[in-house]
């Protein structure tokens, strides 16, 4: 029983860290983007640059994380990243200076990599070491919960608060999420044995496979960052859908909550690589649907497909990487 309680606390730490770094620090920007354009003078081009800078921060963090094998260092950087996620959130509300926003978005990208990659790696290591199934479906529900929560929060807060005040509310939420994200994740065990005394195996794929794999993952990331950042603005500009973009973002979050559990199930039956290919194909369809089909049906269907695949792809990739 104690082991199951500890398992749920570890998974809870991962969920709260993803809600903090991805949901608040990263994705609160998406539903707030139209509001910042209307109230803070943020131009469409500048909004795009901020999204690109955020992805550059994530990419920098991802490359850095890939070069780190020391569990203690991973744990330290993860915890620093969670604090940075809170600081970057408050930075967005303190000014209307583009360059301060740019620094905030870059650091938020680093923080999201700390949660997505370092935090997930630490949790995966704990699960394997304690002889639990090395699947991350419950853990990655945090991304969907964060997206859906931010979407609802912005819709409600916009009735009373301006863009700046909403960033400050998100900062308060981030402070609350920070506590379990740090407290419930135990310090890493650096031994080479599992809890039962079995050796920890590391069987990485070939260098050629990893080069092709990372190139494909990079392309998927580019498509993801554009769609995830601008989905609200894109839907708002489609004929007949003015003001309806927030519903698409909410659909993405709701679809993302159970997505990894579903893809874990699919991967057990088809293999992780086949499941990843299927998810990529469905994500392409989801990105194109709002434009090709049009209307609210196309927007919501596309959002559900996108939300149901992008987190699953990350989970599958990290599970394959071990």
Question: Which positions does each model-derived feature cover?
Answer:
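Pair of pore-lining "gating" transmembrane helices in MFS-fold secondary transporters
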Residues: 7-28, 207-223, 304-308
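Extracytoplasmic gate region of multi-pass secondary transporters
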Residues: 30, 210-250
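Helix-breaking motifs and short loop linkers at transmembrane-helix boundaries and internal kinks
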Residues: 41, 73, 94-100, 293-294
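Helix-to-loop junctions at the C-terminal end of transmembrane segments
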Residues: 61-73, 259-271
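Paired small-residue
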Residues: 88, 99-107, 297-305
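Cytoplasmic helix-loop-helix junction between adjacent transmembrane helices
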Residues: 104-142
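Helix-loop-helix hairpin linking two adjacent transmembrane segments in secondary transporters
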Residues: 134, 138-186
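C-terminal transmembrane helical hairpin of 12-TM major facilitator-type secondary transporters
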Residues: 273-317
């Amino acid at each position: 029983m104690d082991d199951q309680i500890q398992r749920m606390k570890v998974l809870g730490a991962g969920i709260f860290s993803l809600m903090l770094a991805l949901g608040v620090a990263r994705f609160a920007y998406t539903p707030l983007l139209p509001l910042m354009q209307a109230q803070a003078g943020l131009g469409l081009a500048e909004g795009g640059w901020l999204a690109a800078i955020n992805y550059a921060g994530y990419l920098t963090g991802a490359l850095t994380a890939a070069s780190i094998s020391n569990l203690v260092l991973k744990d330290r950087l993860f915890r620093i990243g969670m604090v940075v996620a809170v600081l970057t959130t408050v930075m967005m509300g303190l000014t209307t200076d583009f360059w301060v926003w740019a620094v905030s978005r870059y650091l938020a990208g680093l923080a999201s990599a700390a949660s997505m990659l370092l935090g997930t790696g630490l949790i995966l290591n704990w699960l394997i070491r304690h002889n639990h199934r090395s699947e991350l479906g419950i853990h990655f529900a945090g991304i969907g919960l964060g997206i859906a929560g931010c979407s609802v929060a912005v819709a409600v807060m916009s009735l009373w608060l301006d863009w700046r005040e909403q960033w400050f509310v998100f900062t308060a939420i981030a402070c609350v999420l920070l506590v379990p994200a740090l407290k419930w994740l135990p310090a890493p065990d650096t031994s080479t044995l599992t809890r039962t005394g079995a050796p920890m195996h590391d069987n990485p794929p070939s260098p050629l496979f990893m080069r092709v794999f990372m190139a494909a993952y990079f392309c998927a990331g580019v498509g993801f960052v554009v769609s995830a950042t601008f989905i609200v603005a894109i839907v708002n500009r489609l004929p007949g859908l003015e003001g309806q973009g927030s519903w698409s973002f909410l659909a993405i979050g709701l679809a993302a909550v159970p997505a990894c559990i579903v893809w874990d199930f699919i991967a057990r039956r088809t293999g992780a690589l086949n499941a990843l290919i299927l998810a990529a194909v469905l994500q392409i369809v989801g990105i194109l649907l709002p434009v090709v089909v049009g209307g609210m049906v196309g927007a919501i269907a596309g959002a559900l497909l996108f939300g149901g695949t992008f987190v699953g792809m990350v989970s599958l990739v990290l599970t394959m990487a071990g």
